[in-house]
C-alpha cells in the first residue's frame, strides 16, 4: 500500500500516477478525506479516554464522603463516560478500516515508467539477431510433438485445456534450464528456496494479487487458501511482520516452484502449445533492500535475466513497460521478450519489477536504519527461468531436418547436443 505521509505531502503525484495507470484519481481525495476523519476520530477517542481516566481517578476520593444518592450518580456518570469511550473507539475502528480499505485500492506510485497502455512500452535494448531460415520454420508445438517431448493431447485428456506433459528430453530441457538458473542465482548471492505453492489470503493480498486480477488465481474455497502464480508470493510472505537485517546489503532469495494461473481473461489467446498454460515451473528472484537501493537492485535483477537469456541462445529485447500496463504492486517493470520465429514477433519470457515499499508496507516488513529506527523495506522480483522459455529455445534453434540444437549451456543437463525427430 502507499505511504499516507507521501499521500498527504504530495497528493498530486499520486493522482498523476493513478491517471498514468488508467485508474481512478478520485480515490486519492477519498483517502485524504478518510485519513482526516481517522485522525479526528483518534483525537476524539484519546480525549474521551483521558476524560474517563481522570474521572475514575477522582471518583475514588469523592465516593468516600458521598451519600448513597451521590454515589449512585457518580457511578452512573462513570458508566456514561465508559460507554462514550466505547463509542469513540468504535468510531475510530470504523474510520481506520475505511482508510485501510481505500489504501488497498490505490496502486503503487509509478516511478519513471512511460505513459500509456499495453502497446506504449519503450524498447530499451535488442540483443541478438532473429534467425533467417532457408526453410519454413515449425512452431514449438509441431517441433515438440515430432521430437516426442511435448504431449498436449494427453495433457488435455488428463487435466483439460492448457495442460501438457513434458517427456524425455523435454523434461530434461526444462529441468536443466531451471537448474542452470538456480546455480546462477546462488553464484550471485541468492539463497535458493523451494517454496510452498499454497498460501494464505494475507500473503496473496499483501503482494497485491487480490486486486484487479484476482480472477486469475486459483482459490481453494474449503481451505481459504490460494495456489500461487509465482513464488514471489511465498518469498514476500517469508519475512512478513518481521524486522530484517539489511545492514550488510540486500537480502536475496531465489524461489523454485510450480505455478498456477487460471488465465481467465485469456479466452482464445495462445491456445496452441505451452506459451500460455495453467501450470508451469519457474525460478523467481526476490530481493529485500533499503528503498534508496531499490533502483540499483532492479538493474541487478535485469542483468541476471540478460545473463540467462544469453546462456539459452535466443534473440531478445528489453522493454520498459508503460504505466497503464503495470501490475498494482509495481512502480516500474522491465520485460524481456524473446523472438518467436513462427509468430514473427517478440513474446514475453521474463519480467522484473521494482515494488518499492508497496508490498512490504502491506506485509509489515521493516529494517533498522543507521539511527536504529525501523523503516519500511523495499521489495523487488524477477523471473530467471520458466517453462515458456522452451518455446523460444525450440523455435530459434531448429534445423531444416526438424532437429533442434540444444544450447551449449544446457547440453550437460540434457545429455544431447541435438534433439532429433522420433516421428
From Swiss-Prot:
Region of interest: Disordered: 1-71
Subunit structure: Homodimer. The tRNA molecule binds across the dimer.
Phylogenetic placement of the source organism: Bacteria, Bacillati, Actinomycetota, Actinomycetes, Mycobacteriales
Keyword ATP-binding attributed: yes
Subcellular location: Cytoplasm
Reactions this protein catalyses: tRNA(Ser) + L-serine + ATP = L-seryl-tRNA(Ser) + AMP + diphosphate + H(+); tRNA(Sec) + L-serine + ATP = L-seryl-tRNA(Sec) + AMP + diphosphate + H(+)
Biased composition, class Basic and acidic residues, residue ranges: 1-24, 62-71
Any single GO BP term: selenocysteine biosynthetic process
Protein name (Swiss-Prot/TrEMBL): Serine--tRNA ligase
Keyword Cell membrane: no
Entry keywords, A to Z: Aminoacyl-tRNA synthetase, ATP-binding, Cytoplasm, Ligase, Nucleotide-binding, Protein biosynthesis
Gene Ontology MF terms: ATP binding; serine-tRNA ligase activity
Record EC number: 6.1.1.11
Protein's job: Catalyzes the attachment of serine to tRNA(Ser). Is also able to aminoacylate tRNA(Sec) with serine, to form the misacylated tRNA L-seryl-tRNA(Sec), which will be further converted into selenocysteinyl-tRNA(Sec).
Entry binding sites for L-serine: 230-232, 284, 383
Pathway given in the UniProt record: Aminoacyl-tRNA biosynthesis; selenocysteinyl-tRNA(Sec) biosynthesis; L-seryl-tRNA(Sec) from L-serine and tRNA(Sec): step 1/1
Family: Belongs to the class-II aminoacyl-tRNA synthetase family. Type-1 seryl-tRNA synthetase subfamily.
Binding site for ATP: 261-263, 277, 348-351
GO cellular component terms given for this protein: cytoplasm
Domain notes from UniProt: Consists of two distinct domains, a catalytic core and a N-terminal extension that is involved in tRNA binding.
InterPro entries hit by this protein: aa-tRNA-synt_IIb (IPR002314), aa-tRNA-synth_II (IPR006195), aa-tRNA-synth_II/BPL/LPL (IPR045864), Ser-tRNA-ligase_type_1 (IPR002317), Ser-tRNA-synth_1_N (IPR015866), SerRS_1_N_sf (IPR042103), SerRS_core (IPR033729), tRNA-bd_arm (IPR010978)
